[in-house]
Structures are given as C-alpha cells and as structure tokens.
C-alpha cells in the first residue's frame, strides 16, 4: 500500500514543522529557516525568533496517524504567508475540535480565521463522519471566506507542509463529492441502508476522482479510505 512507505517527520525545537514521504521536506523547511534568517539580517523588526534544533525522523504511517490524533495546534510550527497559514488552519479544523485547541500560535500570525467547520454534514457529502469531512474546493474556499479565490486557496492547499495532520487530502473535486453523494443516496434507498454499505460502495468505486495530491493521487485515495475505515477517529 502507498501508506506503507516511510514518512519523514521534521521538528524544530520539538514542534512539528513538516511531514512528507521523503527528505525533501527537510530541505524545504531548512530553506525557509535560512530565508527567515536572511530577512532578519537585512531588516531588524524587533520580533526576531531564535530557532534551535531541527531534526528529521523516519517513522511508519501508524505513528503519523497517532500523531494526527494526539497533537494540538500549538504543537505545530508553520512557515508561510499569512494567507497560507489561514488556509492550513481551516484544513486542521476539518478533523480537530476547534474549541479544545486554543488560539493560533504566535508564529502563525494574529489574524486567524473566524468560525469553525461544523460536523453536521450540511456543506459536505452526507453519510458517516469520515465521508462528511470531504469537501470540494469551492466550498472549502468559502469556509476560508474567499470563495472568489478558489485557485489561490487550492494553491495554498498544495503547499501544506504537514501532510495527514493538516488533512489537505480531504479537499477533492466537486465531481467526486457529487459521486459520493449519489452513492450515499442509493445506499439509503435500499432495505439495508447504513454507513457500511455506503462506505463499501465508495471504496470499491475506482471511478471516483479524488483529485491531485502533492504526494501522489494513489496515496490521496488511500488516506481517504483510511479516514472512512477508522470510524472511531
């Protein structure tokens, strides 16, 4: 399976700064740190942050998934524009309890997004909790209060440095959402009904397009399947 590969977790001073499937994420984070240092050298702002140890560790997918369930927002260290950080925060809210996570940490900026993602499925697909987390790009852009800027939001999604924990894989094309909704409606019309029938139909339908993913379309599909099979999450 695609998820069976090794995952690289990059930490700075203990905080998670990147998760990917190869060590290029370490180079990317190191480059961002070097850029910030060059900016500070050229222009003192009075808000300089001194970073300590940066390290990368190869782990299995189960450990990444465990981190996804355990970490809080303040356990992350994000580098990017304010807009990108807003989008990443909104992605985080798709799978995490906003009320229990506190505010946006200092290194994310102080102009965070307002509101939270509801769990009633009204903007998503219907069906079980996992499938309700799936959302199309235009609806997610609206959650980011930027429906007219779908491309900009999609670009920020693609630059997400912390895969799985910040679940960018849950944003899929509208055609995929429509297909899943059709499957759900058909399942509800049978005498069996229930989420199990709906999930089974979704997992077996290879025609559903879950869209592009920086780590590969096959891996994106497996991550979504994992979401649907882990009902307790």
Which stretches of residues belong to each language-model region?
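Short glycine/serine-rich loop segments
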Residues: 146-218, 222
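Basic nucleic-acid-binding alpha-helical/helix-turn surface characteristic of O6-alkylguanine DNA
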Residues: 1-147, 186-193, 199, 203-204, ...
């Amino acid at each position: 399976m695609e998820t069976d590969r090794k995952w690289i977790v990059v930490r700075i001073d203990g905080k998670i700064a990147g998760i990917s499937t190869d060590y290029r994420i370490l180079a990317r984070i190191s480059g961002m740190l070097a850029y910030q240092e060059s900016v500070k050298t050229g222009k003192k702002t009075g808000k300089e942050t001194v970073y300590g140890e940066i390290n990368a560790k190869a782990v299995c997918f189960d450990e990444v998934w465990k981190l996804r369930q355990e970490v809080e927002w303040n356990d992350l260290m994000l580098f990017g524009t304010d807009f990108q950080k807003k989008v990443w925060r909104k992605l985080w809210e798709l799978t995490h309890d906003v009320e229990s996570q506190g505010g946006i940490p200092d290194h994310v900026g102080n102009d965070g997004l307002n509101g939270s993602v509801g769990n009633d499925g009204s903007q998503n697909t219907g069906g079980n909790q996992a499938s309700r987390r799936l959302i199309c790009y235009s609806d997610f852009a609206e959650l980011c209060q930027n429906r007219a800027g779908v491309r900009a939001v999609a670009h920020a999604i693609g630059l997400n440095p912390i895969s799985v924990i910040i679940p960018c894989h849950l944003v899929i094309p509208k055609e995929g959402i429509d297909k899943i909704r059709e499957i759900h409606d058909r399942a509800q019309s049978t005498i069996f009904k229930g989420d199990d029938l709906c999930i089974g139909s979704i997992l077996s339908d290879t025609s559903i397009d879950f869209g592009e993913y920086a780590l590969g379309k096959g891996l994106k599909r497996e991550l979504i399947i994992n979401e649907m099979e882990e009902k307790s999450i």
